[in-house]
From Swiss-Prot:
A single cellular component GO annotation: cytoplasm
Location in the cell: Cytoplasm
Protein known as: Trigger factor
The species this protein was found in: Klebsiella pneumoniae (strain 342)
Coiled coil (residue ranges): none
Domain remarks: Consists of 3 domains; the N-terminus binds the ribosome, the middle domain has PPIase activity, while the C-terminus has intrinsic chaperone activity on its own.
Gene name for this UniProt entry: tig
NCBIfam families tied to this protein: tig
GO molecular function: peptidyl-prolyl cis-trans isomerase activity; protein folding chaperone; ribosome binding
Length: 432
């Protein structure tokens, strides 16, 4: 076997391989012998068919199969010999084959980039220092009450957190526009569902009033014909409702799994959940900064084959989220996913190099801790832990999570890490 390797462009490689004629003939003869043992041909007993008859009938197809097999095996031998690490599926380019002559073919592919980590000591990471305060728990309890609130009619003017039922008709330059009219439209105030100025124009009015408000569509509005346009909306305010918050009764508290139904028990449960969320948020905030610094400090070429593969993964994930199938996934434009796919490949390659250079392996105690932390959010944590322990794929996924955490910690060990006091709400809003 003769092998030559050339760089085509960037990470592209072209390996040219020549297989000796006698190697081909020996492989063909060997395969024909195997075929002769199995085939049935009229007039001959099984296994007793003359080789010339077998060769005449099956020679062409056997030779084609043998060439395909030899091309694959010799390519594997070549990349092992040349210490080449292909990224993605190779493209075989067969040369012209002539009976009794050496056969030359080429294989085109990309290789993984050579990554030499640098600039880790210049990465700056700001670690949030946060604790869940009594005031944070109070705010969360108020949120829970609002989520369970009922609505009652209100005689007074509309306030910031009321709910209104309205008819409205919008116009630009005196002309009504598509999508600018609705009847019995229910709007919960303060959620930012409408364009700027719409809710403000309703506040202070009472049920039964009809009035006109002036607003301006944002420049980034989705409808091209309305971007930046001044508009008028005629509003018929039909109903105003205000929240009626439930009291923290034993019955209400037990809805949240607090068996004793006490306020103290609910506060303890809420605090525990908030602290679990907080731990994850701090971890994610630190991790994102470390990875961002790692990417900025290390520009690398990325194999197109790996980006294509990652785009396919993202397409399928997107289709699954919206109930689509494989065919619909492939129809999604690659441009939607290209930037994210490239980013994921770059991060994977860099963290892979961190893992390699630090000789990291998944810490089983960490894996166990991650599973227990995740399971604590469920009603029966022990059942979730047992389910994971019996599922190899889930365990492997969690080992990958642990290994990634260990790689990030290796980066942080060399980075400049400072601490910054912040509040629970500020940190959680950054995560949103």
């Amino acid at each position: 076997m003769q092998v030559s390797v050339e760089t085509t462009q960037g990470l592209g490689r072209r390996v040219t391989i020549t297989i000796a004629a006698d190697s081909i003939e020996n492989a063909v003869k060997s395969e024909l012998v195997n075929v002769a043992k199995k085939v049935r041909i009229d007039g001959f007993r099984k296994g007793k068919v003359p080789m010339n008859v077998v060769a005449q009938r099956y020679g062409a197809s056997v030779r084609q199969d043998v060439l395909g097999d030899l091309m694959s095996r010799h390519f594997v031998d070549a990349i092992i010999k040349e210490k080449i690490n292909p990224a993605g599926a190779p493209n075989y380019v067969p040369g012209e084959y002539k009976l009794g002559e050496d056969f030359t073919y080429a294989v085109e592919f990309e290789v993984y980039p050579e990554v030499e980590l640098q600039g880790l000591d210049a990465i700056e990471v700001e670690k949030p220092v946060v604790e869940v305060t009594d005031a944070d728990v109070d705010t969360m309890l108020e949120t829970l009450r609002k989520q369970q609130a009922t609505w009652k009619d209100k005689d007074g003017a509309v306030d910031a957190e009321d709910r209104v039922t309205i008819d409205f008709t919008g116009s630009v330059d005196g002309e009504e526009f598509e999508g600018g009219k609705a009847s019995d439209f229910v709007l919960a105030m303060g959620q930012g569902r409408m364009i700027p100025g719409f809710e403000d124009g309703i506040k202070g009015h009472k049920a039964g009033e009809e009035f006109t408000i002036d607003v301006t569509f944002p420049e980034e509005y989705h409808a091209e014909n309305l971007k930046g346009k001044a508009a008028k909306f005629v509003i018929n305010l039909k109903k105003v409702e205000e929240r009626e918050l439930p009291e923290l009764t034993e019955e209400f508290i037990k809805r949240f799994g607090v068996e004793d139904g006490s306020v103290a028990g609910l506060r303890a449960e809420v605090r525990k959940n908030m602290e679990r969320e907080l731990k994850g948020a701090v971890r994610n905030r630190v991790k994102s900064q470390a990875i961002e610094g790692l990417v900025k400090a290390n520009e690398i070429d990325v194999p197109a084959a790996l980006i294509d593969s990652e785009i396919d993964v993202l397409r399928r994930q997107a289709a699954q989220r919206f109930g689509g199938n494989e065919k619909q996934a492939l129809e999604l434009p690659r441009e939607l996913f290209e930037e994210q796919a490239k980013r994921r490949v770059v991060v994977g390659l860099l963290l892979g190099e961190v893992i390699r250079t630090n000789e990291l392996k998944a810490d089983e105690e960490r894996v166990k801790g991650l599973i227990e932390e995740m399971a604590s959010a469920y009603e029966d944590p022990s059942e979730v832990v047992e389910f994971y322990s019996k599922n190899k794929e889930l365990m492997d996924n969690m080992r990958n999570v642990a290994l990634e955490e260990q790689a990030v910690e290796a980066v942080l060990a060399k980075a400049k890490v400072s601490e910054k006091a912040t509040s629970f709400n500020e940190l959680m809003n950054q995560q949103a």
